[in-house]
Amino acid sequence: KFMNEFGEMGQAPFILRGDFPLDRVADFIGLLDDRPQLSKVFLDFGCGRLLAGLEDLSDGDWARLCQKIDQHDGHGRLVKGPDGFRKRNVVFGTPRPEWKVMHRIKAAMDPDNIFAPGCLPGKV
């Protein structure tokens, strides 16, 4: 049964991965309203990880979801989404100051941006 439900989540057009402190993940789930509509949610209270299939996600919904994740000291990433959505939005959640360090390392190691262009946070 678990594999069937996990497979159903994989069919959703959007998949969110969230990582939270153990004492914040339940509060985060409690604050979610019906936007965006979740198809399946898997929680691992042992490590604070959430995987959620989303049937629809507007740019505004994503921005609000990122705010809620930040308010609960979490990190969110959209691991699956349509190409158009991924081009318009940063799928790694709210930009963070430490991304600049990753960008400098990437620029030093790959000055021609050959390896995995656009795959680091901040579309680098």
Q: For each of these PLM feature ranges, what is it?
A:
Residues 1-124:
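Conserved glycine-rich FAD pyrophosphate-binding loop
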